[in-house]
Regions:
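Residue-level detector of beta-strand face positions
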Residues: 23-24, 62, 334-336, 377
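A glycine-centered loop/beta-turn motif at secondary-structure junctions
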Residues: 377-413
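Active-site-proximal beta-strand elements of phosphoester/diester hydrolases
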Residues: 230-235, 346-347, 386-390
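Cysteine-nucleophile active-site neighborhood
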Residues: 271-356, 397-411
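Catalytic beta-strand/loop cores that center a nucleophilic Ser/Cys/Thr
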Residues: 342-383
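Residue-level structural signal for beta-strand termini and adjacent loop
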Residues: 36-37, 75, 349, 380, ...
Length: 413
């Protein structure tokens, strides 16, 4: 029998190691075995990899990861547990995760749960003991495959059924997921960044929701602006830290569902429009979002888009998007600002990109990936509108690009 601790992605059913309780099943019959943790069951989606060393809780709760299984390239994931503050949404949205080393117990004073227990409570499946380097190389070589991630405590798997499940999944192209992850009701956002009391030493400013235990201060550093510019944000799968940064920049924020109509949006008397990040194929979401965005552009209100919002803005002005071969997901992606050549280290999470070919003359490219030269930002020359493909709010990741929130709020003043 093979060792259950670390297994190859090339193994087949006959190679199941003794004691293996987790399986990653590919449509072509390949199987990677490991130890399951979190929820039991099986889920089908697209395999991707994420290169951040920290921030796994934020990654797992980012709605942009809907219908995806995340393989973390850093070997030690889950060791500090999870807490009640660092969620980017109320629940996990990634289908599951794959880690190299077995998840240990929580070792941070802010932790309220072990990572494995938290995954189980959120109905998400985890696998440990897989060769995550081999998985990453597979995605880079073949593109993101459809997989079924499965955890059975008794080690009994119907591999033919799991393979058929993987083979029958249609993939992310053509899939609108924004409706699935968007909030359904209008929400007035009031939380800014918070002060965290460290055990010994001065307080430190962190991007927290402030919904945790007594060790987190409940009052935001920057209270919700009462007289500041009013941003109406369209939630296609937004991360909470985006709204915290809008508030810190001095804006009042009202959040509307992804399917909000033009009339519903302007009824809130916005000073500016924000288009959020989100999962799925932008062309599919654009079927209902793009006509609304085009109407909003005609108002000449300032408009700012991030990630999916960037792609939707490009579609609204006549551009095209396409699925990337492997996508960009990590917290250390260098991006060049075209205007002055400055390099920003950014956080990214996208599997689709804007094609610069076909963009109209009224669109100026503002940012470019230094990894592959793909488009990472644009602005309109005839409207007060701009967008970026990456995540300036980070969480996790660097804060090189927080100036974009100040730029947006400044355009509304």
């Amino acid at each position: 029998m093979a060792d259950a601790r670390t297994t190859s992605v090339e193994q087949r059913a006959k190679d199941q190691p003794r004691g293996a309780t987790g399986a990653l099943v590919f449509a072509d019959g390949r199987v990677a075995w490991g130890q399951g943790f979190g929820a039991e069951g099986a889920a089908v989606g697209e395999l991707c990899f994420h290169t951040a060393m920290t921030g796994y809780q934020e990654v797992m709760t980012d709605p942009s990861f809907a219908k995806q299984v995340v393989a973390f390239t850093f070997p030690h994931i889950g060791n500090v547990g999870t807490n009640d503050d660092d969620h980017e949404a109320s629940d996990p949205h990634a289908l599951g995760c794959i880690v190299r080393e077995v998840v240990t117990g929580a070792s941070n004073y802010r932790s309220t749960s072990d990572f494995a227990d938290w995954m189980g409570a959120g109905g998400r499946i985890g696998l440990s003991g897989l060769d995550t380097r081999a998985l990453t190389q597979l995605v880079r070589r073949e593109g993101p495959p459809t997989v079924v991630i499965a955890h059975m405590a008794n080690g009994e798997f119907d591999l033919e059924a799991l393979r058929a499940q993987a083979k029958g999944w249609p993939g992310l192209e053509g899939m609108d997921l924004a409706k699935e992850v968007s909030r359904e009701q209008v929400e007035n956002w009031s939380g800014g960044k918070h002060v965290l009391d460290l055990p010994e030493g001065p307080s430190t400013t962190l991007g927290m929701s402030g919904e945790g235990d007594a060790r987190s201060q409940k009052e935001p550093i920057i209270p919700s602006a009462v007289e500041g510019p009013h941003v109406v944000a369209i939630d296609y799968g937004a991360k909470r830290n985006i709204f915290r940064n809008l508030v810190e920049a001095g804006a009042r924020v009202t959040i509307l569902p992804a399917t909000a109509t033009y009339d519903e949006i302007v009824a809130h008397a916005p000073d500016g429009i924000f288009l959020s990040n989100g999962p799925g194929d932008p062309a599919a979401t654009g079927e209902y979002a793009v006509p609304v965005i085009r109407q909003l552009l005609e108002t000449k209100l300032p408009l700012f888009g991030i990630c999916l919002g960037h792609q939707l803005l490009a579609l609204a002005v006549g551009g095209r998007t396409a699925k990337m071969f492997q996508g960009h997901r990590g917290a250390n992606h260098p991006v060049k600002r075209v205007l002055d050549g400055r390099v920003e280290i950014t956080s990214m999470n996208h599997g689709f990109a804007v094609e610069r070919e076909g963009l109209p003359a009224t669109v100026r490219e503002t940012h470019v990936s230094l990894f592959d030269g793909s488009n990472c930002g644009l602005e309109l020359t005839d409207r007060p509108a701009f967008s970026v493909q990456y995540h300036p709010e980070a969480s996790p990741g660097p804060m090189d690009s927080l100036y974009l929130f100040e730029k947006f709020v400044g355009m509304m003043r």
